[in-house]
């Protein structure tokens, strides 16, 4: 399925365009520039061609970024300056952004979702549109309850509602290395909608589709995961510094070692087999691994993901002090 001919591009609005919203917009707009360059290059009769990526029927061509503060607007203007012709930045005017949009990306803080969506004008402006939420801990049903007072599973195209989709990208979106989890929808999205949502998030990294019941664990693993990995990276770099390596080189070496390891795993190597391959009898690797096992690093890291999963489930409920005590 290719992009339709003519001036039929979609308008994408980001409500609450912070760090993640900027990263997603940047990835999408950079990709659109690449597509235009590829089209221009393919017009040349010389050289060889490679199979083109299958595109959604319609792609975004106009963009709105909605923020509350002037400082946020200035930041977007600087970071997305090369895309200025197709981007409109709105301060304190969410309603216009939603009215202009075909697709709305909801990127505000989870506790603000009620204030942003809970009025009749926004509800009317969203009618028949696609609303993609990247809010941690906020299920589709909660958003539908805010908008409509219930979470009916009727086909929105039959009752004038917007279609709500939940996705969980992570901070690596900034370097287009996100791991995004998209919740499957009931009833399923139409083929054009599904293609568009998947395309949007593959602009910033990898994508998997999982049931809604997996989203809190996905938030913990993928959303919180970069912080967990950064702590491990920092710890091994600290150990190297303690043994005499310069800080900058130790951090670079640790980061590249982690990157290389993930490359092997993404290439199909099982972590346990990889670990065993490096652990020669009587060597330094097995000695270090046993220290990690004695320190229950495996169980502690697993518990961190479990704890973050439980906390993630509370984020959209307005619960205060969710990290004040351990959930049982």
Question: What spans do the regions from the language model cover?
Answer:
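Small-residue helix-packing motif on alpha-helices
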Residues: 63, 73, 97, 113, ...
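Short pre-catalytic strand/loop immediately N-terminal to key active-site residues, enriched for Gly-Thr
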Residues: 10, 165, 215-220, 271-276
């Amino acid at each position: 399925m290719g992009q339709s001919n003519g001036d039929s591009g979609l308008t994408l609005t980001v409500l609450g365009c912070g760090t993640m919203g900027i990263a997603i917009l940047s990835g999408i707009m950079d990709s659109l520039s690449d597509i235009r360059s590829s089209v221009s290059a393919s017009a040349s009769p010389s050289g060889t061609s490679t199979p083109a990526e299958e595109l959604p029927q319609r792609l975004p061509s106009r963009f709105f970024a909605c923020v509350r503060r002037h400082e946020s607007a200035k930041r977007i203007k600087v970071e997305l300056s090369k895309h200025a012709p197709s981007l409109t930045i709105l301060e304190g005017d969410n309603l216009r952004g939603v009215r202009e949009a075909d697709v709305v990306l909801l990127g505000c803080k989870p506790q603000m979702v009620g204030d942003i969506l809970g009025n009749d004008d926004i509800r009317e402006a969203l009618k028949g549109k696609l609303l993609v939420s990247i809010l941690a801990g906020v299920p589709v049903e909660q958003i539908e309850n805010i908008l409509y007072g219930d979470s009916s599973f009727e086909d929105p195209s039959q009752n004038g509602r917007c279609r709500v989709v939940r996705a969980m990208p992570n901070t690596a979106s900034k370097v287009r290395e996100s791991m995004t989890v998209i919740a499957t929808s009931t009833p399923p999205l139409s083929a054009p909608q599904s293609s568009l949502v998947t395309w949007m998030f593959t602009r910033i990294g990898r994508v998997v589709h999982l049931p809604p019941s997996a989203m809190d664990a996905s938030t913990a693993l993928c959303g919180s995961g970069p912080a967990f990995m950064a702590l491990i990276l920092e710890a091994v770099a600290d150990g190297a510094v303690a043994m005499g390596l310069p800080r900058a080189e130790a951090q670079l070496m640790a980061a590249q070692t982690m990157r290389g390891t993930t490359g092997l795993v993404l290439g199909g190597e099982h972590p346990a087999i990889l670990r065993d391959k490096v652990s020669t009898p009587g060597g330094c690797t097995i000695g270090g691994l046993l220290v990690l096992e004695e320190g229950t690093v495996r169980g502690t890291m697993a518990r961190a993901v479990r704890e973050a999963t439980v906390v993630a489930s509370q984020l959209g409920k307005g619960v205060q002090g969710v990290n004040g005590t351990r959930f049982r």
